[in-house]
């Protein structure tokens, strides 16, 4: 039996609540399949599209005097509950259909970051909707947001993405796992908080990369494997070129060379690779599997996906 952290990509969960719910139902079948095979899993998820849409909608309401403005940390908390609820319900239903008596809990999770992290001066995490270049330029002029081109899919707003330092609710996660509870935690990388005087915490406007927090969580609870589910089947080098090549198996030294060659896009594949390296460096006997959400079953059989080891 292996202990596995499964990190679901926010972009892989669809573009609407309805699409997300259908994708989550299918994902629940694969995740419960891991449980029936004797594995112990903890689930994390991204929230890039969802938190951006929540923030956009609340800002629109505030600008039209239809409600108050909300800080980004609160938007992150809303996205954790919204995505977590759909995952939790789908998993509960699938477990029940399989005759498995197991509790599922979504834990709103805070993650400590450093207020002095240089990421606050260099926003890099894409969130929200995809725009054309013309639309992005117009919004940038109107609102002052920063945009980047995101892996050939369009332009997206970027926000600071500081490094996760510690998971505030870690002991609660451990206790739940030890008591045979299926835990959904660290959604969207966790709500970023900074430590103030007397060890109190305060939310800060940012989005932590969910794969980096998932790698930290995996190391903290001594997992055997980190599975990162995204929108593509493999990690590629020379992506979107005539020389595009899928990586089926690789190791962290090779990946470090590819990072030096700038093979991986910032804000999309690069943090996944950095997270894989971090997880394995903290757990040399562990492995990382990166593949698409709808190919999880095939990837677990070794038929598809990128497997990373030391």
Curated annotation (Swiss-Prot):
It is an enzyme of class 2 (transferase). It catalyses: hydrogencarbonate + NH4(+) + ATP = carbamoyl phosphate + ADP + H2O + H(+). Its EC number is 2.7.2.2. GO terms for biological process: arginine deiminase pathway. CDD domains: AAK_CK. Pfam families: AA_kinase (PF00696). It comes from the Bacteria. GO terms for molecular function: ATP binding; carbamate kinase activity. Pathway: Metabolic intermediate metabolism; carbamoyl phosphate degradation; CO(2) and NH(3) from carbamoyl phosphate: step 1/1. One of its GO terms (cellular component) is cytosol. Belongs to the carbamate kinase family. This is Carbamate kinase. The lineage of its organism: Bacteria, Bacillati, Bacillota, Bacilli, Bacillales. The gene is arcC.
